């Protein structure tokens, strides 16, 4: 960020703030989760918490509620409830919700190109906004969304408060 002081432009350096993002490695792809996670960590993401879970059909419906009226909804829910998936809460080194989502999507799309079997069995799901993130985290980490997704209003989006993270 630049500030004006005595007609000189000076740079102010800030401690990086981390935005919470949520990643799901979908059923059938858990054997690749270490490769996927390593790529995210190499890009500066930090693992806050992870879990492996077999979703019920109802939980899958809650996860993809935004697609409720689409033709593929029932098939997607059946697929997501077909086996274990792994959920990761990550801290992103990027400032701002939109920038974080764009950077996360780049990695997601790379892995989809490498490993996807079809449009539905496409390896990864990532949260596309803070509201969905909180709902999705609650599905995987029941009762912990308020603790894990602490929010502050910052410019165009929400950024999670910087916190100590453990790398798993």
Show the residue positions of the predicted features:
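Non-catalytic terminal and connector segments of soluble metabolic enzymes
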Residues: 1-168
């Amino acid at each position: 960020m630049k500030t004006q002081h005595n007609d000189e432009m000076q740079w102010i350096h800030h401690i990086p703030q981390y935005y919470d993002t949520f990643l799901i490695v979908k059923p059938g792809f858990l054997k690749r989760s270490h490769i996927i996670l390593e790529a995210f960590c190499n890009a500066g993401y930090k693992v806050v918490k992870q879990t492996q879970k077999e979703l019920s059909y109802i939980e899958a419906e809650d996860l993809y509620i935004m697609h409720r009226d689409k033709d593929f909804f029932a098939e997607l829910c059946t697929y997501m409830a077909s086996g274990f998936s792994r959920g990761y809460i990550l801290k992103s080194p990027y400032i701002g919700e939109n920038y974080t989502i764009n950077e996360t999507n780049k990695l997601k799309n790379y892995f989809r190109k490498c490993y996807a079997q079809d449009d539905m069995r496409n390896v990864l799901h990532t949260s596309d906004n803070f509201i969905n993130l909180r709902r999705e985290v609650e599905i995987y980490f029941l009762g912990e969304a308020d603790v894990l997704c602490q929010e502050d209003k910052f410019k165009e989006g929400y950024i999670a408060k910087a916190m100590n993270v453990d790398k798993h």
